[in-house]
Amino acid sequence: MVTQALADRLEIIEVCTRLHWCVDHRDWDGLDDLLADHVSFPTPAEIEAPGFDPASYLRSRAEVKAAYPGLLAGLLTQHLITGHQVELDGDRAVCRAHSVNVHLPDGGGRDALVAHGNEYRFELERTEKGWRISGRQTWIRWRWGDETHYEVDRRLLQWADQVRPVSSAECNQREG
């Protein structure tokens, strides 16, 4: 017999894994089935800032979807996510996972390959349509390869500019 807790864990793992699948396949519309209406997606640098508060990085799903293509422009990516650890708390959950992220310039050779070892903390909420990601925090634990063609830090700064911190009221106002 499958318990509700087990079904929830499986759905949460699927949602967190599918986020990276959509990113790698540039399936931006697929994010509609994975992200809450408002999400907190701070960059690694923002997470390390003194006084970091994930609630202050609330953005609309539409803003996050619009910012992703610029972050990944000119790159082939593959995110291998594993080791999901799910903590359920009623209609909210946290899922932690590790990943190895491979980045290669579109049309580039093996010498241009860049890899990152990341740790993720997903925050999820149960909705009428199932579990949705309401927040994600990322820590880059290690880097390998020549990042000069990739410029991850510059790209993340541009991402932060495109999905600047806003209040929940501002998100609702823009969508309204």
Model-derived regions: residue spans:
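Short coil/turn segments at secondary-structure junctions
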Residues: 2-3, 51-52, 108
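A beta-strand edge to alpha-helix "cap/lid" segment located at domain peripheries
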Residues: 73-176
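Hydrophobic, well-ordered secondary-structure segments
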Residues: 1-14, 40-46, 66-67, 97-103, ...
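A solvent-exposed, acidic/Ser-Thr-rich amphipathic alpha-helical stretch
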Residues: 28-100
